[in-house]
């Protein structure tokens, strides 16, 4: 086959002059985006680019997760369950992408990482304000996390705002209450700046929804969507843990944590405990 025959000709109407038009690069601000990868190792280590891009893309996805979860919470407040579930469905797909993304970083061997890790100083994923905001939005509130971000006023304010706002679970329970379900008053009037604690009185409410799904389909579907969210989050946490274990073993984290041991404890945290507890009660 000749080169000429293996070439796609540009159609005559394809725009070529962008001197006064918005282009792909200008719309996405690619010069800014693609200049943000600045390795600090000296001499520059080949694999640091992977490390930087892995974390930068994670931050972009987390930005979208927050965008969708905030919208979902707002739609729940206005009783628009359909729109809320649509946003949550999108978040679930993002979560799967984030989880699979660990497989790329896992190609970084312990030897390779050790050759530039010392240049990272005390920077650590633990300091990701967006990750912390996602945990807060899902209900894992912890005011003691805020001091980590005092040197970044914008991030500190963002997290403070999320801490003070109801979580998506709080909004869902308030929605159910407005729909006539008997949600315990203690949950409707709780201090939303604190992590949700297991409430046994809520389990019978979910039991009724699950055992009468046909009559409560919207609530039933929402319950399952939230279960998916937590499952996906736990899978992400697990892949994070395993990637750390295979890369640095049981070394302490760059930010001062115990490393893998600290990540292991995160697997014990839960967002929607009653939605898992009800499974024991269904059919009994």
From Swiss-Prot:
Entry note: cofactor: Binds 1 heme group per subunit.
Binding site for substrate: 51-55, 113, 117, 254
Chemical reaction(s) catalysed: L-tryptophan + O2 = N-formyl-L-kynurenine
GO biological process, one term: L-tryptophan catabolic process to kynurenine
Top EC group: oxidoreductase
Example of a GO MF term: heme binding
Cofactors named for this entry: heme
Keyword set includes Chloroplast: no
Keywords: Dioxygenase, Heme, Iron, Metal-binding, Oxidoreductase, Tryptophan catabolism
Residues annotated to bind heme: 240
Biological pathway: Amino-acid degradation; L-tryptophan degradation via kynurenine pathway; L-kynurenine from L-tryptophan: step 1/2
Chain's role: Heme-dependent dioxygenase that catalyzes the oxidative cleavage of the L-tryptophan (L-Trp) pyrrole ring and converts L-tryptophan to N-formyl-L-kynurenine. Catalyzes the oxidative cleavage of the indole moiety.
Entry's family note: Belongs to the tryptophan 2,3-dioxygenase family.
NCBIfam families cross-referenced by the UniProt entry: trp_2_3_diox (TIGR03036)
Subunit structure: Homotetramer.
Protein name according to UniProt: Tryptophan 2,3-dioxygenase
Organism, scientific name: Arthrobacter sp. (strain FB24)
Gene of this entry: kynA
């Amino acid at each position: 086959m000749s080169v000429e025959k293996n070439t796609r000709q540009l159609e005559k109407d394809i725009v070529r002059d962008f001197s006064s038009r918005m282009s792909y690069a200008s719309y996405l601000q690619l010069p800014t985006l693609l200049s943000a990868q600045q390795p600090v190792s000296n001499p520059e280590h080949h694999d640091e680019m992977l490390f930087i891009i892995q974390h930068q893309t994670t931050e972009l996805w987390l930005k979208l997760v927050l965008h969708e979860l905030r919208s979902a919470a707002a739609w729940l407040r206005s009783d628009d369950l359909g729109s809320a579930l649509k946003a949550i469905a999108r978040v679930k797909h993002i979560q799967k992408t984030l989880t699979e993304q660990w497989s790329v970083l896992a190609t970084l061997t312990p030897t390779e990482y050790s050759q530039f890790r010392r240049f990272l100083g005390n920077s650590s994923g633990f300091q990701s304000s967006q990750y912390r905001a996602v945990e807060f939005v899902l209900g894992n509130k912890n005011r003691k996390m805020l001091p980590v971000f005092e040197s970044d006023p914008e991030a500190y304010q963002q997290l403070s705002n999320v801490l003070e706002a109801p979580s998506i679970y709080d909004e869902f329970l308030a929605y159910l209450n407005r729909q006539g379900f008997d949600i315990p008053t203690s949950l409707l009037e709780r201090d939303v700046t604190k992590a949700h604690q297991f409430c046994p009185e809520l389990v019978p409410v979910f039991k009724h929804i699950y055992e009468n799904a046909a009559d409560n389909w919207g609530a039933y579907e929402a319950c399952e969507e939230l279960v998916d969210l937590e499952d996906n989050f736990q899978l992400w946490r697990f892949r994070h843990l395993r990637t750390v274990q295979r890369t640095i073993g049981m070394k302490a984290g760059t930010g001062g944590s115990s490393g893998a041991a600290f990540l292991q404890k995160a697997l014990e945290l839960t967002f929607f405990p009653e939605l898992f507890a009800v499974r024991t009660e269904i059919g009994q």
